[in-house]
Amino acid sequence: MRILIVEDEKRLAGTLQDLLRRQGYTADVCYDGISGLDNARSDIYDLLVLDAMLPGMDGFALLRQLRGGGSRLPVLMLTARSELNDRVRGLDAGADYYLTKPFEPEELLACIRSCLLYTSPSPRDRTRSR
């Protein structure tokens, strides 16, 4: 399974990438919203782990554009924005899960497993359905 992490905090992005790789996932990182959107549109990923506050384009705008283009890529928002209105905004934009920082690695991994099991077909199936 291939996961795209869009996170501007390089230290956290590296920690997430290491955690996911130790679990057997392939994990790539983008550090800004614009490159994150470009990569998420590539149809090679099984899951997007997305921060809300990013340079270039915030995670909410990225998600609206991704969903507006018809993408069904599963999205887990992972952000420090913990207010109710932020969570609602993320879910309304199309996030499948919304997890706040700080987080426990076990909870993050459980959300990822759930996203991968219950949300959307694999990239190959998404491509075939077009």
Feature locations, PLM:
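N-terminal/domain-start alpha-helical segments
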Residues: M1-L117
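Conserved small/polar residues in nucleotide/adenosyl-binding loops
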Residues: Y118-T127
